[in-house]
Regions:
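A short acidic, Gly/Pro-enriched loop at the edge of an enzyme's catalytic core
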Residues: 44-53
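Short, well-ordered alpha-helix to beta-strand connector turns
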Residues: 31, 51, 77-78
């Protein structure tokens, strides 16, 4: 959906990567360029500095080596935009305190069938970027409706559902 929006409204040329045949078919029906590719195999098939911007939307938590994938994204692109569900959100914390793994609109799967294998918080992501010497140019924290607020900005690790 993001690539379709960017293509239609911002005249962006881009490529999506996906493994799911249904998702690939939907992209093609919308006129979005898509390549069947497993992100867990890395991005070696792309030359360095191939793209101005590389975007990963709500996928970081489901890859085997998110740290290596971030470095690969920066190898093939000048900048990256990454979004992920914030596992530090108060609703997630409350469910854990009640003895359950979180299930919510932005984390809809039960613990036994989730594709999410590396859940992280906003703070965890920032620590990883610092460890990898990745400079975060801009941060945005939003609720489950993708809206920001002054309150979320005060305590993003606790109050945001997603981080960009």
């Amino acid at each position: 959906e993001l690539l379709s929006y960017l293509k239609t409204n911002k005249s962006v040329t881009g490529y999506g990567l996906d493994l799911d045949a249904t998702n690939i078919e939907q992209c093609l029906q919308k006129g979005v360029n898509v390549i069947e590719h497993d992100l867990n195999r890395g991005l070696d098939s792309f030359a360095s500095n191939s793209f101005a911007i590389v975007v990963m939307t709500e996928t970081l938590q489901s890859v085997e080596a998110p740290d290596q994938l971030l470095l690969e994204m920066l190898r093939i692109g000048n900048e990256c935009i990454v979004s992920f569900p914030n596992f530090g959100n108060w609703r997630c914390r409350l469910q854990i305190a009640m003895g359950n793994m979180p299930v919510s609109q932005h984390l809809p799967n039960s613990w036994f069938d989730t594709p999410n294998i590396h859940l992280c918080t906003c703070r965890d992501f920032e620590v990883l970027c610092k460890k990898l010497s990745i400079n975060i140019i801009e941060k945005k924290y939003v609720n489950s409706q993708h809206n920001s607020s002054p309150l979320i900005k005060v305590a993003p690790n606790l109050l945001s559902a997603f981080a960009f």
